[in-house]
Amino acid sequence: MSRKSYPNVNAANQYARDVVRGKIVACQFVIQACQRHLDDLMAEKSKSFRYRFDKDLAERVAKFIQLLPHTKGEWAFKRMPITLEPWQLFVICCAFGWVNKGSRLRRFREVYTEIPRKNGKSAISAGVALYCFACDNEFGAEVYSGATTEKQAWEVFRPARLMCKRTPMLTEAFGIEVNASNMNRPEDGARFEPLIGNPGDGSSPHCAVVDEYHEHATDALYTTMLTGMGARRQPLMWAITTAGYNIEGPCYDKRREVIEMLNGSVPNDELFGIIYTVDEGDDWTDPQVLEKANPNIGVSVYREFLLSQQQRAKNNARLANVFKTKHLNIWVSARSAYFNLVSWQSCEDKSLTLEQFEGQPCILAFDLARKLDMNSMARLYTREIDGKTHYYSVAPRFWVPYDTVYSVEKNEDRRTAERFQKWVEMGVLTVTDGAEVDYRYILEEAKAANKISPVSESPIDPFGATGLSHDLADEDLNPVTIVQNFANMSDPMKELEAAIESGRFHHDGNPIMTWCIGNVVGKNMPGNDDLVKPVKEQAENKIDGAVALIMTIGRAMLKEPDDFLSSLDPDDDLLIL
């Protein structure tokens, strides 16, 4: 008996290995997606890991899609079947190959792919939709190609319809009727059709394809499709898009969710995501970055075309943003994060514990925000190594009121609540009773910290801090009220960045602190680019933990020869209680 072969799965896994090893040029998000897959392949050997990679399923889907014909351009004229490139095989095999060990049902309910134009989005989406429509063992499958306009909804449905019309064996084998504006299977009532705008609440999709998600002003279609999948055994939400301009829209929000999943700050075992773009710091005018953002370069998008578009963009500022967005997948209206999250993650040391610093003085800092919101406590230790100051962030604490986590009514707060719920389950976020955070919880944590390590100072955000400040003073925890202005925050913010980049900063990998650090945007003082303070791009992008950490760095710097506050007016900028 001949041994089974898995050429497509093998190519997908080899792609992941080549990306991680640096043999294929890729951005950090692609590297993280590949590393996640490889890590999970190792983890599946453990009984505690809930999922396994089913090579047969993955190979089956990849083979099915490659039986379908091209519907556009030269390859369609030559009647050539689709050939999936290694990156496409990786996405397909991950999306369909990972299953629950017990049920064998699909692991990933949501798949988000962000990729520049002309990289074969519509063809791969049409293939996925047809597979779910005809071959996914779902009785009466409903498959929708959803978009905000009729033209966009047909971008996936039209090639899928043409694939069926040009493949009689497919329609005969699965009993597919191809109509003018929909396809159906009379045998079980399955149907596949385009969907425009808000679909209402009657749909029960098995698969929903959302093409060019960045064009959606609201998440109405996406959410309705997702919530309508409850009656399906293994539904699939397939979103594929280029970058856009609306960072207030649902696509950018989903992008942030994917990034948080990839960097581990908010785990989500049912979400697969991959983002093809350039890295922070890359020069968009450098021809070398084209391959990083465009995995299909030389196949469906030609290098010469991209080089000409790049040159036009360099010569015409009006075209620069279009090129960055559509060909490099850069959200041009999004402000860059201040701290390099890759460097931050390289500073992670999960072996750090409070016991290692027992008896050593520490600085506690508190960012209290609003009582309805997240409140933070950062804990910092310092050590001198080879004449240089090393900083250690260990066991930060975070609190949020119960109602903020579990009694959410407003749609815009839902994503934040889901994020908080994940952290509560992980044991890194403390929920306090009621609608407001009870500061007595925070005081008790500060008192407990002082028993482990003597607290030298407690810098605190002045917003609503009067009561807690007095309580801290009563416990001899030396509260210091810090006004979060340019003068007080600039130098410690720069020192934290320098310490991260030089390896002088160490942290225990707390996911909430990582999330807060990743949300920090630097705002320069008008007329003075040398002064900077931390701000957030959007209200839901909390930076409380990062602000508290920056305050601890500022107080630690006071002990160094260069006193960063020596020139300040203490009455205006620093109030010591």
From Swiss-Prot:
Q: Which Pfam families match?
A: TerL_ATPase, TerL_nuclease
Give the family per the record: Belongs to the phage terminase family.
Magnesium is among the record's keywords: no
What keyword terms does UniProt attach to this protein? Viral genome packaging, Viral release from host cell
Molecular function per GO: endonuclease activity
By what name is this protein known?
Putative terminase large subunit
- The source organism is Shigella phage SfV
